[in-house]
Amino acid sequence: MTRFVLFICCFFLIGMVVECKDGYLVGNDGCKYSCFTRPGTYCANECSRVKGKDGYCYAWMACYCYSMPNWVKTWDRATNRCGRGK
């Protein structure tokens, strides 16, 4: 029983340390990375460049990435500044 409790505790600690996020990649201008006219592997390559596990061109024609580190900027409706002055 003690080993089981220890295993569960370690499992939660690992989960807290290895935090990843999913979302749309954002450029310096605050806009999502467009993939409308890009090759099929463009988003997967861009996502791997920022240490994401995988990515694809979503219906909004923007790159969506999975399992990226927390330091990567992602698009958020609340903080959207695309098309606005800096």
UniProtKB/Swiss-Prot annotation:
Residues 21-83 form the LCN-type CS-alpha/beta domain. Residues 1-20 form the signal peptide. The modification Arginine amide is found at R84. One of its GO terms (molecular function) is sodium channel inhibitor activity. InterPro entries: LCN-type_CS_alpha_beta_dom (IPR044062), Scorpion_toxin-like (IPR003614), Scorpion_toxin-like_sf (IPR036574), Scorpion_toxinL (IPR018218), Scorpion_toxinL/defensin (IPR002061). Its main location: secreted. GO terms for biological process: defense response. Expressed by the venom gland. One of its GO terms (cellular component) is extracellular region. It comes from the Eukaryota. Belongs to the long (4 C-C) scorpion toxin superfamily. Sodium channel inhibitor family. Beta subfamily. Beta toxins bind voltage-independently at site-4 of sodium channels (Nav) and shift the voltage of activation toward more negative potentials thereby affecting sodium channel activation and promoting spontaneous and repetitive firing. Strongly affects skeletal muscle channels Nav1.4/SCN4A, poorly affects the neuronal channels Nav1.6/SCN8A and Nav1.2/SCN2A. Induces spastic paralysis of rear limbs, increased salivation, apnea, tachycardia and increased perspiration. Negative results: does not affect the cardiac Nav1.5/SCN5A, the peripheral nerve channel Nav1.7/SCN9A, and the voltage-dependent potassium channel Kv1.5/KCNA5. This is Beta-toxin Tz1. It comes from Tityus zulianus.
